Design a protein with these regions (language model features):
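One-carbon transfer enzymes
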Residues: 1-241
Length: 241
């Protein structure tokens, strides 16, 4: 087992969670517990795409999405449990699980669009979320594309969650170079840059068991991006070299 930190990894069975687990392993860290959230697979549905890789010089770990999440979790987690037929983050069993084990930190890697309920955030345990976007300037779910169009790079921000979307205190943030043409943006690049910042944050937490400094978000600087027109999305992809 790698060097352990008292953390619960609250993980959807997703490409993002795979990237997080793999970078934790690569960084020589581990977590005390993982709670894996597995949705019931609908009949006739396919597995998520593994994403296209490409040669790059980004100097970050690219996830191998062909590796099952459970395989990496077994390597990084002292103990893990699974919720089968997962129906949503408001499941009372999740709150009970967190209350029982009382980790010092929760890494939240839920399914897209999920908001951690106030009851869970009120447990007095910090929930760490890695947002793809340089906060407060880029809020929402399509920030990778708008950031590429506007600035030619992409930002990532580590925040401690509050009930409001993307509105928590900033632990740290960083801008990353644009990916090369041909690299899958949604499943590879986006998750890789999030995971890279997560590694940095967990290394700090492992040393101090706390975050010593925060940046408060300035609402006057914020912009929210949810929907992107297919033409704009295509232009963002074409901008890559």
């Amino acid at each position: 087992m790698n060097k352990q930190v008292d953390i619960l990894f609250l993980a959807a069975d997703s490409s993002r969670s795979k990237a997080y687990a793999q970078v934790i392993q690569h960084s020589g860290l581990s977590v005390s517990r993982t709670l894996l959230l597995k949705k019931k697979k609908a009949k006739g549905t396919n597995s998520p795409p593994c994403g296209k890789s490409a040669s790059h010089d980004l100097k970050i770990v690219m996830p191998d999405l062909k590796i099952p999440l459970i395989e990496t979790v077994e390597q990084i987690s002292d103990k893990f449990d699974v919720i089968e037929n997962y129906g949503g983050i408001k499941n009372s069993g999740i709150i009970e699980y967190i209350s029982t084990h009382r980790p010092k930190l929760v890494i939240f890697s839920g399914y897209g669009g999920e908001l951690v309920p106030k009851e869970m955030l009120g447990l007095g345990i910090p929930f760490l979320h890695i947002h793809s976007g340089f906060l407060p300037k880029y809020r929402g779910s399509t920030t990778v594309y708008y950031s590429l169009l506007n600035e030619g790079n992409c930002g990532v921000t580590a925040i401690l969650l509050k009930p409001e979307i993307d509105n928590g205190d900033i632990v740290t943030r960083r801008k990353y170079p644009a990916p090369p043409s041909g690299l899958d943006l949604d499943h590879i690049y986006d998750n890789a840059i999030r995971a890279d910042l997560l590694s940095e944050v967990l290394t700090e937490w492992n040393e101090n068991q706390e975050f010593k400094e925060f940046i408060k978000q300035d609402e006057s600087e914020s912009e929210t991006y949810y929907v992107i027109h297919p033409v704009l999305k295509h232009l963002a992809i074409l901008s890559l070299r």
